[in-house]
Amino acid sequence: MSIQVYNTLTRKKEPFIPLEPNKVKMYVCGPTVYNYIHIGNARPAIVFDTIRRYLQFRGYEVQYVSNFTDVDDKLIRAARELGEDVPTIAERFIEAYFEDITALGCKKADVHPRVTENIDTIIQFIEQLIEKGYAYEVDGDVYYRTRRFSDYGKLSHQSVDELKSGARIEVGEKKEDPLDFALWKAAKEGEIYWDSPWGKGRPGWHIECSAMARKYLGDTIDIHAGGQDLTFPHHENEIAQSEALTGKPFAKYWLHNGYINIDNEKMSKSLGNFILVHDIIKQVDPQVLRFFMLSVHYRHPINYSQPLLESARSGLERLKTAYANLKHRLESSTNLTTNDEQWLAKIEELRNEFIREMDDDFNTANGIAVLFELAKQANVYLMENHTSQQVIQAFLQQFEQLFDVLGLSLQQDELLDEEIEALIQQRIEARKNRDFALADRIRDELKAKNIILEDTPQGTRWRRG
């Protein structure tokens, strides 16, 4: 079965057929860099990084572009409040963004274009829209003629008449129509600006992504993605700008991730329940946060709470423990035994099941359920008296490959095998010397590290719990 993708544009799942065989052009809207990112910003970074990884796993060559909005009203306001200039603030939070997403297991995009590095491209785009009659200039501002684009509203599934009822013109604006939106904003006193055919100013938000997506990926791209909150007006306006200019579809598939709620309340600044990634990863393993995000289908809302985060931590630890136990058993395993073909077939079936789930609109939640079944089967196998290196290797390979698809690490902050053996030896010596208090202390220390000891007539054996 081919990969099926839910397309916001058509509101249904469709077979994923890229424009060029085995090549995928993917554009993901990045952050406005005026502060540290919050967990709502982290979700699309994690989700679309995982989708990119899965497409690569399935053999596609993915060209992945994600932008930085490094000049806009929020940045100008932050610069004014902090007494710094816009480029300094943007640079600081771009660096912070990379630190945060790297901690969360996200790979960098192939290109991270910045608005300030593409002003000429944006100006040329606007000039062409004016030439085609889709835009007009008023006193240094340039607006897009929304009604001129007959398909306006097709992504958010709203009609122009419905939109008009909620539209209004702000004081001082000179639009022809309340639905028109800014492509270029004339600079106010003291604001950062660039020279343009319409005077000093800066780009509007929506035009930036249209211009940069076209520059780096071409007129039509395979996947355009972002948070659900960007569907309207941002992505709707991108379509209007890009398709008016080129006369071609802007993107074939539109993917949007769901919202994050905090303790069953929508995350919002007014409620003061924003959680910065910068802060939370000091308290929580970033891998746990990633695992938590992927444990829910990307289109569904997530409820963020400490109990759910703890459940994610416990679940991830169970998977890592199964992997660690397999590695521990590897050296003591033998060659193929009689029922190994049955186990190898079972492992292959679980791999295929993972692929089936991920092929169904990148269902990481069900993919993770398959990983738990893989861990369960591994634990059953390790209960056998004789285990084979080939089967252990097959289990290990699947853990490693599927964890990599999800951007997760199998490393544990734990004692090394050599450290465990050394502590067991100390405990044996303590018991010989009848120092039972020390022996019990060592057992308790190992138990706290999830190491279970079994005293047998043949000596002390251990396993990870």
From Swiss-Prot:
CC terms in the record's Gene Ontology section: cytosol
Cofactors required: Zn(2+)
Cofactor note: Binds 1 zinc ion per subunit.
Enzyme class name: ligase
GO terms for biological process, alphabetical: cysteinyl-tRNA aminoacylation
EC number(s) reported in the record: 6.1.1.16
Family: Belongs to the class-I aminoacyl-tRNA synthetase family.
Identification of the protein by name: Cysteine--tRNA ligase
Species of origin: Anoxybacillus flavithermus (strain DSM 21510 / WK1)
Organism ancestry: Bacteria, Bacillati, Bacillota, Bacilli, Bacillales
